[in-house]
Amino acid sequence: MPLSSLLVQAFNDHPLGLCGQHDPAKSVASVESVEQRLNLLTLGAVLDTNHLNAERWSALAALHDHWLLDPPQAAYKSSPQILAIMQQLHIAGPQYIARVWWQICRGVQGRFKGSWRDLLKANDDNAQTLQRYLQQSQTTFPVFAGPVISARWLDLIHRIGGVTLQDWDRLTVTLPPEQIKTARKFGITEAEVHPLVSSALEVWSTSCRNLPAESCGLAGCPGK
């Protein structure tokens, strides 16, 4: 499915979204600092194994100036301290996520003095180059070596983080089994799609309420 499709346009650009629902991560765009947005999107991508909803993204965005989301500070805490503050802040997720986040903060602090923006620049602000770099840095940036989570993360950085990435449109993810049936309703037969398409399918599957055209940005919705 092309990025110019009606589904993607409604999800990403239309004021009405999909039955009023938009990309749940868009609340991060309200944070003024680019570096803070990148911190938020990075932790969100780590937590987002099953797509965070808008409420969880908004709660995360409200913590944009907390030390947990500042790698130069978080890197010098201990893994148990990270877990304790996540629990205190009611950031839900498996306990191992705390150690993963701690390792990632230590990695970006050690290599780029805690700056995700510098990591992006060092890889020419190129999505394909960044994916290769992350795949080769599994110990330093655990989980981001995986092709799906790295593609989702880079998609968020390009669309919401405020950093334009070259070759963003070439990112792909494998459709998860639960999205295949939904994808077929939109004529998608490919096994791999752009992460933006996958995110749009996820939101459509939970938001479609067969609302009239004036309440939804998707023309020709297969749910009607």
Task: List the model feature ranges, each with a label.
Residues 1-224:
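HhH-family (HhH-GPD) DNA N-glycosylase catalytic core used in base-excision repair
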